[in-house]
């Protein structure tokens, strides 16, 4: 019971912290609601890049694949391998979800280093990679949580919740807390790594000539890709775990 109360209090404190603003932000007013426009603008750009490149490649498939078709087929095979390794033989229906997570996070991370967001002037604040905002990473983590709950319940029904008292009912609070910490760890890991990478590059560019930070920028591109892979792999692992019922 103490563990449950502690977790509830933790989430209340996190909710209070979410109301604190650091820096300036650009909002759209929609009725009584304020929408965080910076994240929406950059997210739409990333989605447009993904949709546009996909349409260009698949609208006229060739018998002898060209470079773009070969690249997309390689990416699809890679995502299928990751899904099959983590989920098992029932991986098929989850390939689109895992692939969407991986590609959105990958392109979002790279957009922070390759697209000149800062030159676009806003009335307040500035644009940055979508994954540089905690709202985006939390939303992706919550989607993952919904996915693995759905996977477990759709396969086992209400018997899925029996995992919380395995191997002994004494572990019930800890097993419940584990499901709350999964989205927290997913979201903060991705947000922290992307934010830290962009801050390091900004500080180096302001202190030394542009040539010096270039190796750090290339390292940032590599780590950004790794973070996308880690997020997608963990999401697939959580889905596979909920379907198999083991930890």
From Swiss-Prot:
UniProt entry keywords in alphabetical sequence: ATP synthesis, CF(0), Chloroplast, Hydrogen ion transport, Ion transport, Membrane, Plastid, Thylakoid, Transmembrane, Transmembrane helix, Transport
Primary localisation category: plastid
Transmembrane portions of the chain: 38-58, 95-115, 134-154, 199-219, 220-240
GO CC annotation, single: plasma membrane
Entry membrane topology: Multi-pass membrane protein
Entry's Gene Ontology molecular function annotations: proton-transporting ATP synthase activity, rotational mechanism
Pfam families: ATP-synt_A
InterPro entries named in the record: ATP_syn_F0_a_bact/chloroplast, ATP_synth_F0_asu, ATP_synth_F0_asu_AS, F0_ATP_A_sf
Keyword Thylakoid listed: yes
Localization terms from the record: Plastid, Chloroplast thylakoid membrane
SUPFAM superfamilies: F1F0 ATP synthase subunit A
Function: Key component of the proton channel; it plays a direct role in the translocation of protons across the membrane.
Subunit structure: F-type ATPases have 2 components, CF(1) - the catalytic core - and CF(0) - the membrane proton channel. CF(1) has five subunits: alpha(3), beta(3), gamma(1), delta(1), epsilon(1). CF(0) has four main subunits: a, b, b' and c.
Family: Belongs to the ATPase A chain family.
Protein's name according to its UniProt entry: ATP synthase subunit a, chloroplastic
């Amino acid at each position: 019971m103490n563990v449950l109360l502690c977790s509830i209090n933790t989430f209340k404190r996190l909710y209070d912290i979410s109301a604190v603003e650091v820096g300036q932000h650009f909002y759209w007013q929609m009725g009584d609601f304020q929408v965080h426009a910076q994240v929406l603008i950059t997210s739409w750009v990333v989605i447009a890049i993904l949709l546009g490149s996909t349409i260009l490649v698949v609208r006229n498939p060739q018998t002898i694949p060209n470079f773009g078709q070969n690249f997309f087929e390689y990416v699809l095979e890679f995502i299928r391998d990751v899904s099959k390794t983590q989920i098992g033989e029932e991986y098929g229906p989850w390939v689109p979800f895992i692939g969407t997570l991986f590609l959105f996070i990958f392109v979002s991370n790279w957009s922070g280093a390759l697209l000149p967001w800062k030159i676009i002037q806003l009335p307040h604040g500035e644009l940055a990679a979508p994954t540089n905002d905690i709202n985006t990473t939390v939303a992706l983590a919550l989607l993952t949580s919904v996915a693995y709950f759905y996977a477990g319940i759709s396969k086992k029904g209400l018997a899925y919740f029996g995992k919380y008292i395995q191997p002994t009912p004494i572990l019930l609070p800890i097993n419940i807390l584990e499901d709350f910490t999964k989205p927290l760890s997913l979201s903060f890991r991705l947000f922290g790594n992307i934010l830290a990478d962009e801050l390091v590059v900004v500080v180096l560019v302001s202190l030394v000539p542009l040539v010096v930070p270039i190796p750090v920028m290339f390292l940032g591109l590599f780590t950004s890709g790794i973070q996308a892979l880690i997020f997608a792999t963990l999401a697939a692992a959580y889905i596979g775990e909920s379907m198999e019922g083991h930890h």
